Design a protein with these regions (language model features):
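C-terminal subregions of glycosyltransferases and related glycan-biosynthesis enzymes
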Residues: 189, 211-308
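Nucleotide-sugar donor-binding/catalytic module of glycosyltransferases
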Residues: 1-222, 307
């Protein structure tokens, strides 16, 4: 049977974490002979009783649950530290503290990953189901990406929701080879690696309930004006971040990609920042894309202005 490590980062999550822990322990992948799993948790300095709950679960399920307290470094560093510390395993899954996993989430992920290539890093993710704080479905939803996942998308947009990500030992080794000094989010970093050097599978079927509440920043407004405001706000917030992230990607993995056309594309993307006409030619000659047509149009403007 394969081995699987579920990696959770917690911070003041006492309100919902019991439901999440119970859903993790109810995963049927081990009963069905797909993968034996353990849950490894790093607490990022909680002060609301989260640590007491973690200690309770570790005491009740010592063969399944372990946790430790780290310094308050934020969610990105917390997940990367977990990847550095955990034992070797066939697969790894990222997990948030306030969601709810359907019992066959890991079974589905392992079945897909088992069928993917063995000579490259592989990543599985799925579309989350939006629910309210009581786990009741919301009218709005995260729509499936209309375009195929790929590096030309990953350079400028992330479609991987971290709490749905499951990946193999090869991808883990590439992440911990050298941690980035900057990345927008840990799940975006996985998307870049998988699409540049390996394979990704995006599952359109939701296998987690993605809880929306005051402590969760995902917006779900559906009015057209609100959507456009959110788009421009998101692009302004990422100003310079896309380039900075790709610079780190090239710094760390450049020696692995001498013949990799994706890496060459990323290098060219950074070079054309110096010239409007070079950016215009780049936009005409390459096929970078965002998943939504409206976002694609906005990014074309951002690229021409050099504000990426």
């Amino acid at each position: 049977m394969k081995t699987l490590q579920i990696l959770m980062s917690t911070y003041n999550g006492a309100k919902y974490i019991r439901e999440q822990m119970d859903s993790l322990l109810d995963q049927n992948c081990e009963k069905l002979g797909k993968a034996a799993f353990r849950i490894v948790i790093r607490d990022d300095g909680s002060s609301d009783g989260t640590q007491d709950i973690l200690e309770e679960y570790a005491g009740r399920y010592p063969e399944k649950v372990s946790w430790y307290q780290g310094e308050n470094h934020g969610v990105i560093c917390s997940f990367f530290e977990l990847l550095q510390r955990v034992d070797a395993s066939d697969y790894y899954a990222f997990c948030d503290q306030d969601d709810y996993w359907m019992e066959d989430k890991m079974t589905r992920a392992v079945e897909i990953l088992d069928a993917m290539r063995k000579d490259v890093p592989v990543l599985y993710c799925c579309r989350p189901k939006l629910v309210d704080q009581n786990l009741q479905p919301l009218e709005s939803e995260i729509k499936r990406p209309p375009m195929r996942p790929g590096f030309r998308n990953a350079m400028i947009e992330n479609i991987v929701t971290g709490c749905t990500a499951v990946f193999d030992q090869s991808l883990r080794e590439m992440v911990v080879k050298e941690l980035p000094q900057f990345t927008v989010m840990h799940d975006w970093w996985l998307y870049l690696i998988a699409t540049c050097f390996g394979e990704i599978y995006y599952d359109e079927t939701p296998y987690i309930c993605y809880r929306q509440h005051q402590g969760n920043v995902l917006g779900t407004k559906t009015r057209k004006m609100d959507e456009w405001k959110m788009r421009f706000k998101r692009f302004r917030g990422n100003r310079g971040n896309i380039s900075h992230q790709l610079e780190e990607f090239i710094r760390i993995f450049g020696d692995m990609g001498a013949e990799n056309e994706n890496m060459r594309l990323a290098e060219r993307f950074l070079k054309v920042r110096k010239s409007f006409w070079a950016r215009k030619r780049f936009l005409r000659d390459t096929e970078l894309y965002r998943q939504r047509r409206e976002d694609d149009r906005i990014f074309h403007i951002i690229l021409l202005l050099g504000n990426y």
